Amino acid sequence: MKVLAIKLVDYREWTERLGYDREWLIQKIQNKFMMKIHEIASQYSTFPLQLRFDNFLMIVDGITNTQLIYMINDMQENLPVGIKTCLGYGKTPLEAQWNASVCLNNKEDKFKEYVDEKIAALHFDINFNTEALKYTSVYDSFLEITNIYVDLSRFLYKIGGILQYLGGDNYLGFVSTNSVNKVIEKFSDDNKIKVGIGIGQNARTAIKLATTSLEKIRNNREKTWHIEEE
C-alpha cells in the first residue's frame, strides 16, 4: 500500500511569530487550511488523516506519481509554511506510513514507482452514543469517545491499520484487504460498535463504500458489520 507523509516545515516557528494571544488564531488558520487540503485531496480521490495538523498522512493507492506532484503543489499554494513530503510503501497502511515517516528525515523527496493496491476503509460508529448524551455530561461523553478511540487504535495497530477520529462518535480506519476478516471477526458480535467496510481502488471510493455499508447496517439493526466492494 502507498502512504504519503506530509510535514509542515518550520510550523512551530510560524506559530510563535503570531504573538502570545495566538491560540484562537492558530485554530482558525489550521481549520482553514485543512478545509482547503480536504478539498484538494478529494479532487485527487484521496483523504488526509490530519492527526497532528503539522504532520499528516494520505492513503494514495490509485494515484499516479504525476498526480501526486500536482496535488502537493496545489497544497503548497494554500499553506502558510513550506511542506516536505515522502511516499512510503508497505504491506499494510501502518508499515507504509512508517516507511514514509522515516523517509521524511532524508534529504531527497523523489517518488519511487510502487504497485497500487485496493484500499479497505472502515467507518466505525458507536451504538446509542447520541442517546446517551441525555444522561451524561458533554465532557464525560467526550472521555468515552476518547477511550474508544484508544482501544480501536490499539486493535488496528496490531493488524497493521491506522485510525482517524472524524468527530461525533465516528472514526475512520484503513487496513490492508488481507486484514478485513480480522476486523469482521472482532466486531461481528460487538453490540457497542458497528463498522461499515468499503473496498475500492482509491481512498475516496473506499470511504464512500464504507459509509454506504454503515448506512445499510443502520437500516438493518440486526447486523454489526457490512462490506461493499468496488
UniProtKB/Swiss-Prot annotation:
For molecular function, the Gene Ontology terms on record are: GTP binding; GTP cyclohydrolase IIa activity
What EC number(s) would the UniProt record show? 3.5.4.29
**Leader sequence residues:** none
> What PANTHER family is this protein classified in?
GTP CYCLOHYDROLASE III
Record protein name field = GTP cyclohydrolase III
Its gene is: gch3
Similarity field? Belongs to the archaeal-type GTP cyclohydrolase family.
According to the UniProt entry, the coiled-coil residues are none
Give the organism, scientific name: Saccharolobus islandicus (strain M.14.25 / Kamchatka #1) (Sulfolobus islandicus)
What processes in GO biological process is this protein linked to?
A: biosynthetic process
User: Where does the source fall among the domains of life?
Assistant: Archaea
What is this protein for, i.e. what is its function? Catalyzes the formation of 2-amino-5-formylamino-6-ribofuranosylamino-4(3H)-pyrimidinone ribonucleotide monophosphate and inorganic phosphate from GTP. Also has an independent pyrophosphate phosphohydrolase activity.
**Matches recorded under Pfam families:** GCH_III
Give the reaction(s) catalysed: GTP + 3 H2O = 2-amino-5-formylamino-6-(5-phospho-D-ribosylamino)pyrimidin-4(3H)-one + 2 phosphate + 2 H(+)
